[in-house]
Amino acid sequence: MAASFDYRQPVGRGSYVGLGVNLMRDAAGISNFNRQTGAISASVMRQLGGGRYSSTDQFLVAGAQVGIGQQGFEWNQLWFSSQYDVANAAVNFDNPNGEAFINNMSDLYVDFNAGIMWYALFDERQSFYIGGALHHLNSPNITFLDQTNELPTRWVAHLGGELPIGDELSLLPAAAVMGQNQSLSTTGGVNFRYTNREWREIALRAGAWAHVVNQLESGFSLDAITATAILEMEEWNLGFSYDITTSTLTNANNGRGAFEVSLIYTHPAKSRRARVNCPNF
C-alpha cells in the first residue's frame, strides 16, 4: 500500500519548485516480512525551450529525497534446519533455531535518493522523456542482527514517450532498467491510449509489460508479465493491473499473480497560464 502527494510552485518565468511526500507499507509471505518507509522530496524544474516562439516545450527536472524506513518479520513463523526432528520426520518448533535474532524489527534508518529527468513535448500527443536516479546513496544499515548489513546503492534509468497513430489512438512505450550490485532488472512495454474528441477529457489505456531479471547462474529470464488498464478523467486516473508470474516462483505462489489498484488525483491549474505541459506516463 502506498500514498503520495506533491505540490508545484512557480518561482519565476519558466522555473518551478516542487515538494512531495511518499508513504509506503508492504508485507508478504508466511513470515509477514514487511517494510514501511516515509520520505519527503524537493525538486527544481526549469523550462529550457518552448513558449511563445517555439512549438516544442522542453523541461529539465532535478530532485532529491530524504526518508526513514524500517523492516520487520515474524521469525517465529519460520523453521530452520536445526528444528527438524529426523526421528519423527517433522519440525519441532520447541527446538532452538540456532539463529541470533535480536528482535522482529530493524532499527530506523535514514535513506537518501536523487534523480534527474529531461522531457520534451512536440505536440499535444507527441512527447519523449529520459531520466535516471540513484537510491540508497548512503547505503543504510538494515540488519536484524547485531551486525552491519548495508543496503547497496541502486541505480535506475528510464525513458518513454507518446506516439500518435491517427486522430484517436496513440502508443505510450516505456522502459526502465535497475541495477543493484550484481542484480539487474528491466521492465518494458507499451500502453495503447484511445480518446475521442466527443469524450472531452476522458481517455482509455490498455497495455502489457514484461519484467526481465538476471539469474546469476542462468542469465536473463522472463520473470513476470503485467496487464494494465487505465481510465483517464479530467482530474482523476483510475488504474488496474495484474501480474502474471512466469518464472519458477510459480512453484511457491501456485501461479497466482498480484492484483493492484491505483488512484491518482491532479488538482487543476488556476489558469491556463499557470498550467505546465507534462508527458503522459
Language-model features: locations:
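Subset of outer-membrane beta-barrel
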Residues: M1-F281
